[in-house]
Amino acid sequence: KKSSITFTNEEGEQEEEDLVYNRTDFWTTSSNKQLNFVQHINTLLNARGKAAVVVPDNVLFEGGAGETVRRKLLETTDLHTILRLPTGIFYKPGVKANVIFFDKRPAGPERQTKEVWVYDFRTNIHFTLKQHPMTDADLEDFICCFHPENRHQRHETWSEDNPDGRWRKFAVQEILD
């Protein structure tokens, strides 16, 4: 059975051999566990399923198979939001992570993602699990900006006049170029 909503964080700490998965339902073959995890989540969603997936930065910036996975996500899903997480909350210290939010759409001739909203919760922010843990209150601004069901109500807080604003919209072509 396909899922309508998935929120998940891939366990990145396990030591295991590099395996290359050659699945016909994946967009590309890779030994990168995080890229395979994103592809796997996509296969679990029903035609209108929604996902929020915690991924390390390399999923957003890696070339080769990483670029293929990103392009396919932009083409076949509405990858509408990226939440750039501060260091020290999910992974070992120094590893940079994000939450990517995407909605699966039925296949069509046009690219499904038109724009991507990015909330920079990383710049000048740091948490630790024990001494300075993140709380619900720390996410209030993101939640106010997010509007998951009414994205037309979103408004950027970043501008050239307000470079400290954390909420910014990018046209998908800006990301692809």
Question: Can you describe what each PLM-predicted range is?
Answer:
Residues K1-D177:
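A conserved structural/catalytic subdomain of Rossmann-like adenosyl-cofactor enzymes
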